[in-house]
């Protein structure tokens, strides 16, 4: 599709680690103080091929392991149907996960049975907590059926003109 030719799909696992540190050190800490056993909902806008979504899933899952009784759901949206399909498959090359801490690789990645492929897949326990859907911010009326505790919109809004950023 044309959108795949013109959109930027730059993304990495644990891109800009300080954002994830803020999530655990501040946002999630405050969340557990003010919410008893509930579902923490995150929206990753412009999720590309899913690295940010699955990074969020790992970080949140790690946090909630020491705060029992909490669940989480993550919605990833993107304009590209191809990127969304890649996100749902959750298959990545070894080099895509090279910078990920070893203990997280062991816990959250499954190696391909075919070793020559040099690919991994996100474990089902995380994949089931992550949903993906198409969204175009340029549509005059886009509606989200859900409310969210946190919205990550950091890798998409920078590509819009100031007036469009304001509308988004």
Give each language-model segment a name:
Residues 37-56, 72-75:
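Conserved class I S-adenosyl-L-methionine
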Residues 66, 70-152, 156-164:
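Extended basic-aromatic, gly/pro-enriched interface segments that bind polyanionic ligands
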């Amino acid at each position: 599709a044309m959108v795949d030719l013109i959109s930027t799909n730059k993304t990495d696992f644990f891109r800009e680690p300080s954002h994830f540190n803020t999530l655990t050190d501040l946002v999630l800490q405050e969340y557990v103080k003010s919410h008893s056993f509930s579902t923490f909902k995150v929206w990753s806008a412009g999720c590309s091929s899913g690295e940010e979504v699955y990074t969020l899933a790992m970080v949140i899952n790690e946090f909630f392991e020491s705060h029992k009784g909490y669940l989480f759901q993550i919605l990833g949206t993107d304009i590209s149907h191809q990127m969304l399909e890649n996100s749902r498959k959750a298959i990545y090359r070894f080099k895509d996960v090279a910078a990920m801490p070893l203990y997280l690789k062991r816990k959250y990645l499954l190696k391909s049975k075919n070793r020559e492929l040099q690919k991994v897949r996100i474990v089902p326990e995380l994949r089931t907590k992550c949903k993906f859907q198409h969204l175009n911010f340029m549509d005059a009326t886009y509606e989200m059926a859900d409310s969210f505790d946190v919205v990550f919109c950091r890798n998409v809004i920078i590509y819009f003109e100031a007036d469009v950023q304001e509308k988004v």
